[in-house]
Amino acid sequence: MISPLPTPCEWVDGKAGVSIPLDDRGLNYADGAFETMSCSSGEIACQSLHSDRLSLALEALRFPHPEAIAQRVFDDICRCVASVGHSGTARLTVTRGSGPRGYAPPDSASPRHILTLFPLSGQTPDRQSCGIAQIRWAHQPQLAGLKLLARTEQVLAAREAATQQWDDMLMLDAQDHVISTSRGNIFVFFGNQCVTPDLSQCGIAGTRRQLLIETVLPQLNYVVDEQPLTLAVLRQADAVLISNTVRGVVSMSRIEDQHYPESAFPRRIQDALRQQVASWVGG
């Protein structure tokens, strides 16, 4: 059952009922970054992880004083989320603000932030099917790992999934390395060994991915390695899991004609991640 939304549920620079100007550079040039976050009873989970990643994205985009901007923005959105006691998800978008025509950002730009709240969705399936997307991740190491507004590859991959009736699409780079799905990060299991793709050239380094690598999987006695990954390796795996903020952890039932048996251990990882996220609520 989908929970009702609070009122207000949208803010621009901390103010409800404000429109976004047509000269906003996020709208015109995707000049900005965003974060998707989970909230519980008016508090944002993994707040510091999201704030740190936002700061890195703003630094890569050459925003002035990125850490200060991220801190100010999170102070503001935490107030908004708390004011309505929201439980569900939230999207934070930070743009460079308004500016004249042309790619070059103005020196006088004033960053703008938009917060949108979404209700708790109904229960999602524990397992999902994946096709293999035709669209490939482009290498751009200067922007790798960051959640920037320009998400063209994932938009096209998601369109492929809908057209071909897959739950999600596996996304590779031009060198045929597996990077992610259109919705999340990938973890491949061989016994107690876990491999997750190296994201130094492209992809998004998710906050749930970070928790899994640094805390959850080691606590469950898995050895985690970040390295290039191929489809051939995936086909030999015991299990493949996908992580993101909204769904937590979901296991793959199949990748095209490759089927993976149902197992209890993805549920243990899901439960452990959920407990870890709960401990980060408000922090």
Regions found by a protein language model. Give the residues of each.
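Ordered, amphipathic secondary-structure segments that act as subunit-interaction surfaces
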Residues: 83-94, 101
